[in-house]
């Protein structure tokens, strides 16, 4: 940690502590609370279970609930069933690489137990690296070290906490996405494009991140028009746009092609163990080698669209039913947060928003005073990204996933609450510090001042403003409630 500045050390320390606490609590809740008998994917265990496997299951079994079972199944058996293709291959491949590092334990543990250990260790690593990457990105975009630090600390107690620890792809996706954004802010387009492509191989919404590359290229094009004739920059823009689209969409295209070859080409059925064949027969899961599914005859045969439609009933306004009101209530806080952030930014920078962030001021001779923090002009493209994800998720997806969907995809989820804390909380309202230095707070005699601004707020809870209490209660409630419910197959997905 000698190469890290004090703020980075604080983020790293707090992130590791939160991850370890999460693993301990999920084991505790999994032990003392009986599992709910949910109608979820539950494949049979093919390997015999020894005492070491039972110990691993007892300690880490809470990480294998709901969709985590799909990722573990894919990592162990591959893409056998049609609906497995709803889950992208990036995270299962990472789990397989993790189990290779655990090869010395494979004589003691079954493949599934090794995968569970891999889930715990890799997601601890990915979520910690994501916190560090978010802090780095915040310093580059916000130009406000205190706000960047506060946002990274908030990520450590994210409302999507359980999904950053369990066998889900959110932690890996957040790390790749925040890292790609940071590389783009540094002007490293190639590195950013490759990281965005990797993220698109982890989750489908990684394709939306293509917009960051396109916006950056359009900004460069507009800047070059002031000194060059338009033709050369235009040709360069078209070439870079085409290349960006190709690079970022390639993992998705290859994944869809793999599914087409498996399900739509004759003689492509893999060998499947009998218990898994029986599961397919009992549950009606489609296997390769049977009659070709309907999507094979589409003009654009995309299995992903078909699965979301048929298996998960994902579509415009399909989730708007009276029985889903509790799930809409669960998604209300994150919706309010992003809408509030959008309104605050648009009312502060109307001209910047009208010009899509390509021209900062209407009057170049009398430019407005530059803002720092969340209201920085650089935040515009990130806000558009967050708003687009919210609109799509709210209209077309199962709304209860909005929290983890946004919390792992957009830094706005943490930048805006950090802005609220710094703007509305008198305890944090002081002169900004230089990059790399932690704020020095006054403390009572004989008591060491906390370097972590969140810990300071927890210590002085009674003096906190109502806005601060609302933000922290939201983050901590979802942080803890998600662990209690999700780890016992209760409805928190």
UniProtKB/Swiss-Prot annotation:
Residues 35-77, 135-136, 183-192, 256-327, 400-469 are lumenal. Not N-glycosylated. InterPro entries: PIG-V/Gpi18. It comes from the Eukaryota. It holds the Pfam family Mannosyl_trans2. The chain crosses the membrane at residues 14-34, 78-98, 114-134, 137-157, 162-182, 193-213, 235-255, 328-348, 379-399, 470-490. This is GPI alpha-1,6-mannosyltransferase 2. Keywords: Endoplasmic reticulum, Glycosyltransferase, GPI-anchor biosynthesis, Membrane, Transferase, Transmembrane, Transmembrane helix. Alpha-1,6-mannosyltransferase that catalyzes the transfer of the second mannose, via an alpha-1,6 bond, from a dolichol-phosphate-mannose (Dol-P-Man) to the alpha-D-Man-(1->4)-alpha-D-GlcN-(1->6)-(1-radyl,2-acyl-sn-glycero-3-phospho)-2-acyl-inositol (also termed H2) intermediate to generate an alpha-D-Man-(1->6)-alpha-D-Man-(1->4)-alpha-D-GlcN-(1->6)-(1-radyl,2-acyl-sn-glycero-3-phospho)-2-acyl-inositol (also termed H3) and participates in the seventh step of the glycosylphosphatidylinositol-anchor biosynthesis. Residues 1-13, 99-113, 158-161, 214-234, 349-378, 491-493 are cytoplasmic.
């Amino acid at each position: 940690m000698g190469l890290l500045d004090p703020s980075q050390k604080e983020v790293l320390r707090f992130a590791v502590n939160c991850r370890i606490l999460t693993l301990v609590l999920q084991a505790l809740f999994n032990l003392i609370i009986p599992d709910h008998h949910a109608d979820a994917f539950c494949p049979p265990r093919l390997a015999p279970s020894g005492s070491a496997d039972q110990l691993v299951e007892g300690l880490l079994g809470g990480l294998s609930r709901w969709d985590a079972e799909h990722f573990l199944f894919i990592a162990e058996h591959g893409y056998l069933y049609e609906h497995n293709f709803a889950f992208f291959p990036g995270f299962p491949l990472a789990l397989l690489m993790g189990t290779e590092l655990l090869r010395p334990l494979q004589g003691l543990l079954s493949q599934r137990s090794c995968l569970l250990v891999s889930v715990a260790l890799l997601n601890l690593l990915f979520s910690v690296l994501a916190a560090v990457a978010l802090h780095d990105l915040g310093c580059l975009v916000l130009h406000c070290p205190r706000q960047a630090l506060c946002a990274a600390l908030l990520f450590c107690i994210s409302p999507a906490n359980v999904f950053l620890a369990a066998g889900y792809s959110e932690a890996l996706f957040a790390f790749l996405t925040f890292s790609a954004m940071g590389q783009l802010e540094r002007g490293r387009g190639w590195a950013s494009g490759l990281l965005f492509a990797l993220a698109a191989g982890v989750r489908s919404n990684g394709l939306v991140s293509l917009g960051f590359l396109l916006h950056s290229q359009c900004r460069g094009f507009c800047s070059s028009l002031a000194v060059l004739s338009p033709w050369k920059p235009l040709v360069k823009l078209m070439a870079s746009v085409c290349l960006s689209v190709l690079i970022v969409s390639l993992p998705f295209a290859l994944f869809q092609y793999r599914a087409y070859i498996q399900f739509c080409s004759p003689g492509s059925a893999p060998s499947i163990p009998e218990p898994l064949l029986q599961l397919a027969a009992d549950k009606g899961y489609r296997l390769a080698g049977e009659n070709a599914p309907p999507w094979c005859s589409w003009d654009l045969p995309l299995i992903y669209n078909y699965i979301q439609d048929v298996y998960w009933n994902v579509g415009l306004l399909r989730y708007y039913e009276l029985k889903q009101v509790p799930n809409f209530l669960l998604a209300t806080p994150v919706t309010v947060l992003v809408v509030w952030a959008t309104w605050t930014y648009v009312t502060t920078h109307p001209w910047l928003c009208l010009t899509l962030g390509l021209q900062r001021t209407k009057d170049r001779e009398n430019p407005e005073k530059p803002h720092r923090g969340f209201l920085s002009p650089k935040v515009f493209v990130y806000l558009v990204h967050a708003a687009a994800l919210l609109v799509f998720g709210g209209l077309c997806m199962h709304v209860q996933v909005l929290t983890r969907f946004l919390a792992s995809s957009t830094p706005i989820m943490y930048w805006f609450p950090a802005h609220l804390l710094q703007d509305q909380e008198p305890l944090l309202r002081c002169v900004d510090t230089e990059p790399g230095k932690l704020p020095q707070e006054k403390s009572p005699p004989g008591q060491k001042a906390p370097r972590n601004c969140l810990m300071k707020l927890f210590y002085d809870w009674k003096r906190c403003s109502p806005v601060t209490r609302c933000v922290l209660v939201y983050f901590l409630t979802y942080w803890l409630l998600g662990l209690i419910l999700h780890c016992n197959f209760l409805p928190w997905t």
